[in-house]
């Protein structure tokens, strides 16, 4: 199983602090459904950090993800659709993103083995059924 471990920085558009507050509250207030979307993306860990640096606001995404999950843009989940709306309103596209380079990735063997088992289960249920959309959208 191939894992991607990322830490990426994005700049928030000027004047969007209150909207970012709303965005983070939305994700926290809908955590059960938010976690379901992560399963479909094979996203095992996702954490959002926030920082003010030299008077500018930034959001950082830390993630641990296996290959082969659905892309957020392909999701039918209301969580993902709303997340994309907030993203487009709040994230400054002129800044791009800054990916920090991992130097050491430390995942204890029992945790890695659990992720491998989840990866196998995902492939057996989602991929082998020939689904092209998130299972959440099929219910």
Where are these regions (language model features)?
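An amphipathic, aromatic/His-enriched active-site/gating alpha helix that lines ligand/cofactor pockets
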Residues: 33-44, 65-112, 123-139
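Short, well-ordered beta-strand segments in beta-rich or mixed alpha/beta enzyme
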Residues: 6-11, 20, 46-78
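N-terminal low-complexity, charged segments
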Residues: 21-56
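Long, hydrophobic N-terminal alpha-helical segment
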Residues: 1-34
């Amino acid at each position: 199983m191939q894992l991607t471990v990322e830490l990426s920085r994005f700049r928030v558009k000027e004047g969007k602090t209150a909207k970012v507050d709303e965005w983070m509250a939305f994700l926290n207030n809908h955590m059960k459904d938010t976690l379901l979307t992560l399963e479909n993306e094979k996203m095992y860990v996702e954490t959002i950090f926030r920082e003010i640096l030299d008077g500018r606001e930034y959001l950082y995404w830390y993630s641990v993800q296996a290959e082969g999950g659905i892309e957020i843009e392909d999701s039918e989940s209301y969580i993902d659709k709303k997340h994309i709306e907030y993203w487009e309103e709040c994230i400054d596209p002129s800044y791009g993103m800054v990916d920090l380079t991992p130097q050491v990735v430390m995942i204890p063997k029992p945790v890695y083995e659990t992720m491998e088992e989840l990866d196998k289960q995902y492939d057996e249920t989602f991929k082998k059924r020939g689904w092209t959309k998130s299972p959440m959208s099929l219910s």
